[in-house]
């Protein structure tokens, strides 16, 4: 089986994440896509939202997708999340499968500063997608580039729009938007 893994905070998951997953199905011909929410990312703060809420939103986003699943290995392990450890966890579950680690070009730019990058590229197929740059970045690490569309939205922009009372309709899966509204998530002062 061919499995793509997409790690992130998903704070919140939005249509850019879902659109990328669909493009990965097409370009990589994967059988399964695993969304892996991080517990405590190394280079990012997750503010004012519980792990429970982030997972609930992810479940709502993938509920009608037959090839998309959530793996909570980083949540279960707790603490700071390193990709090399996440990969070890996934490879223990999917011993005989081809694993594709998908990262954005914004992260790939600093990939050599990650914990054990050599071990990562030895363990999985590294796939880079466009998030910021339209041109391909050069690296000493073996990787594959996907010529995906850059989707000009981010979770931080969505949080900001909600705090400011601006519309976010159609930027989020409908059930995720409803969950955010029903639980007053990302509202300023909360």
Swiss-Prot record:
Pfam families named among the record's database cross-references: CTP_transf_like (PF01467)
Catalytic activity: nicotinate beta-D-ribonucleotide + ATP + H(+) = deamido-NAD(+) + diphosphate
Leading EC class: transferase
Entry's EC annotation: 2.7.7.18
MF-aspect GO terms: ATP binding; nicotinate-nucleotide adenylyltransferase activity
GO biological process, one term: NAD biosynthetic process
Membrane spanning residue stretches: none
Superkingdom field: Bacteria
Pathway: Cofactor biosynthesis; NAD(+) biosynthesis; deamido-NAD(+) from nicotinate D-ribonucleotide: step 1/1
UniProt keyword annotations, A-Z: ATP-binding, NAD, Nucleotide-binding, Nucleotidyltransferase, Pyridine nucleotide biosynthesis, Transferase
Family: Belongs to the NadD family.
Function as written in the Swiss-Prot or TrEMBL entry: Catalyzes the reversible adenylation of nicotinate mononucleotide (NaMN) to nicotinic acid adenine dinucleotide (NaAD).
Protein name (record): Probable nicotinate-nucleotide adenylyltransferase
């Amino acid at each position: 089986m061919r499995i793509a893994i997409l790690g992130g905070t998903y704070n919140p998951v939005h249509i850019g994440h879902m659109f990328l997953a669909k493009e990965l199905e097409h370009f990589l011909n994967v059988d399964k896509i695993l969304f892996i929410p991080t517990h405590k990312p190394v280079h990012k703060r997750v503010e004012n939202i519980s792990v429970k809420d982030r997972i609930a939103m992810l479940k709502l986003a993938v509920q009608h997708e037959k090839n998309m699943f959530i793996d909570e290995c980083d949540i279960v392990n707790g603490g700071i999340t390193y990709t090399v450890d996440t990969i070890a966890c996934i490879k223990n579950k999917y011993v005989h499968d081809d694993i594709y680690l998908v990262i954005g070009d914004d992260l790939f730019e600093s990939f050599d500063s990650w914990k054990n990058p050599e071990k990562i590229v030895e363990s999985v197929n590294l796939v880079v997608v466009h998030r910021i740059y339209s041109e391909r970045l050069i690296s000493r690490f073996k990787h594959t580039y996907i010529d995906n569309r850059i989707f000009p939205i981010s979770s931080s922009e969505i949080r900001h729009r909600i705090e400011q009372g601006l519309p976010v309709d159609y930027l989020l899966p409908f059930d995720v938007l409803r969950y955010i509204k029903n639980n007053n998530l990302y509202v300023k002062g909360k």
